[in-house]
A protein has these predicted regions:
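His/Glu-rich zincin catalytic helix
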Residues: 1-56, 165-269, 308-312, 393-400
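Charge-rich, well-structured scaffold segments of protease-associated domains
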Residues: 54-204, 220, 236, 258, ...
Length: 400
């Protein structure tokens, strides 16, 4: 579009349309003294525009059975809706209005701040959730990627209309956003004035590899919880295309080690065989310029050392010898099946469609992803394991 907005549409015969805006504006884009501002702006975007009240925004789609929602990550903010196809135009108009014309009225801030502060306190009461952010704060210390997305209650209470307008005028621009739509026969006209000038896409503050994981080692925090919560992890791969082979190898390896299947190596070793944990899982997070692989587990405080030894033993196996062809093929089959089932969740598929287009300028292609998984070899898995699971690169955080 002349204004710089990118749009992607995947038609569907379904009577429901999923659509929205993905904006490259997350907590990593916050400047000094702005921690939590991206999430604050997400909340306040629903509180009024130049021509809509908060009540009108709330009721606009719900009156016809639709839904309106949003979320903030470290790299983007997403506003999205689901509506019967007949009301697609209504949803497009509303989403465009709140994203590009919100006024963030001061009279609404006082009420919404209390909602956000309750969200922060609720999050702080959940160590199984909090430890993930605390871990990234250690890993990315000194960089906005290390900030908690929600911010602190003290900081959030200080935000004003001027703060929200300053942040969104810098980042909520057509050239920094993608409009996505899954469903319907054709992409509707998006009501952004032609006078809106296209601007170059914003460049993020890149992280140099030398600055990653300077805090490698063990950190213990006394949380006074009944159960111990443990995170360990190391740097991994960013979204760069020249790391595609490594990223897909780690994607498969992560699913084998601690993916969502009950047959994951760590779940079988720690839970099924020994009954040491209720939850153990691993994950890989891919940012534009860096990445993170980590494992989380919850166990009795007296079992922490034993659990860590068992995790280390499993990681060493992948470093020491390649997977057999039978196990590798079984792992690929499982992951391909999971991806296929994921595609049946239409809302999540729509959100992924927008996310991939925002950051990679291409449509989501599950068939291509499955082919990339099939191309991974046992030697690829072992090479990536030796790189990611190197003990000297590991950071460990323990809540007791």
């Amino acid at each position: 579009m002349p204004c710089g907005l990118r749009a992607i549409h995947m038609p569907s015969s379904s009577p429901v349309v999923y659509l929205g805006y993905q904006i490259a504006a997350g907590s990593r884009d916050e400047r000094e003294n702005e921690e939590g501002l991206a999430h604050f702006c997400e909340h306040m975007t629903f509180k009024g525009t130049e021509r809509r009240s908060a009540w009108n925004i709330l009721n606009c789609l719900e009156a016809v059975g639709g839904s309106l929602n949003a979320y903030t990550t470290k790299e983007c903010t997403v506003f999205y809706a689901a509506v019967p196809e007949h009301y697609t135009r209504r949803a497009v108009d509303l989403l465009t209005d709140i994203v590009f014309h919100s006024t963030y009225p001061q009279k609404e801030i006082g009420k919404e701040v209390e909602v956000i502060c309750d969200e922060i306190e609720s999050y702080n009461d959940s160590p199984a959730d909090l430890i993930y952010d605390d871990f990234e704060n250690i890993v990315f210390h000194g960089h906005p990627l290390g900030h908690n997305i929600l911010g602190t209650t003290e900081r959030v209470r200080s935000f004003t209309t001027a703060d929200a307008l300053r942040f969104t005028s810098r980042l909520y621009t057509p050239s920094n956003a993608v409009f996505f739509m899954y469903g319907g026969k054709k992409l509707p006209t998006i009501p952004i004035g032609s006078a809106t000038l296209a601007e170059p896409r914003l460049q993020k503050t890149a992280i140099s590899s030398a600055s990653l994981f300077s805090a490698a080692g063990v950190t213990t925090r006394d949380k006074g919880t009944h159960q111990a919560h443990v995170m360990l992890g190391s740097p991994s791969y960013g979204a760069s295309n020249d790391l595609l082979r490594e990223r897909m190898s780690l994607y498969l390896l992560n699913n084998i080690i601690g993916g969502r299947g009950m047959n994951s190596r760590l779940n079988v070793t720690l839970r099924e065989h020994r009954g040491l944990v209720y939850t153990v899982e691993s994950s890989m997070t891919t940012y534009g310029d860096t990445g993170l692989w980590c494992t989380y587990l919850g166990c009795d405080k007296g079992d922490v050392r034993r659990c860590l030894r068992l995790v280390r033993h499993e990681l060493d196996k992948f470093m020491d010898e390649p997977l057999s062809e039978r196990r590798l093929n079984a792992a690929k089959k499982q992951l391909r099946g999971q991806l296929t089932i994921d595609c049946d969740n239409r809302e999540n598929f729509a959100l992924d469609l927008g996310s991939v287009y925002l950051f990679r300028d291409k449509a989501r292609d599950v068939e291509k992803t499955c082919k990339e998984i099939d191309a991974v070899t046992a030697e690829d898995i072992q090479r990536v394991a030796r790189h990611i699971f190197e003990p000297s690169k590991m950071t460990t955080l323990i809540y007791k």
